[in-house]
Swiss-Prot record:
Organism: Karelsulcia muelleri (strain GWSS) (Sulcia muelleri)
One cellular-component annotation, GO: ribosome
Family assignment from sequence similarity: Belongs to the bacterial ribosomal protein bL27 family.
Matches recorded under Gene3D superfamilies: 2.40.50.100
Domain of life of the source: Bacteria
Name of the molecule in the record: Large ribosomal subunit protein bL27
UniProt-listed GO biological process terms: translation
InterPro entries, alphabetized: Ribosomal_bL27 (IPR001684)
SUPFAM superfamilies in the record: Ribosomal L27 protein-like
Key words of the record: Ribonucleoprotein, Ribosomal protein
GO molecular function, one term: structural constituent of ribosome
Length: 84
């Protein structure tokens, strides 16, 4: 057994940078084609009309219009863009 504690035992002190996930444009706001509406991990929000999902589950607008959020279940929410 050691009589003195080993110095330099800092196992903590590292952290990852935040991924900046979440809603970028809210309901009622205007979206341009290609603009990011939601950045997410997995499919918490699902695309509906005039919206497409990227390979990292980011939801983008296809057209110029107003954003509409709609919930069907307690967990599922759908995003669509209504043309103006």
């Amino acid at each position: 057994m050691a009589h003195k504690k080993g110095v330099g035992s800092s196992r903590n002190g590292r952290d990852s940078f935040s991924k900046r996930l979440g809603v970028k444009l809210f309901g009622g706001q205007i979206a341009k084609p290609g603009s990011i509406i939601i950045r997410q991990r997995g499919t918490k929000h699902h695309p509906k009309k005039n919206v497409y999902m990227g390979k990292d589950h980011t939801i983008h607008s296809l057209i110029y219009g107003k954003i509409l959020f709609k919930k069907t279940n307690k967990k599922k929410s759908f995003i669509s863009v209504i043309p103006i």
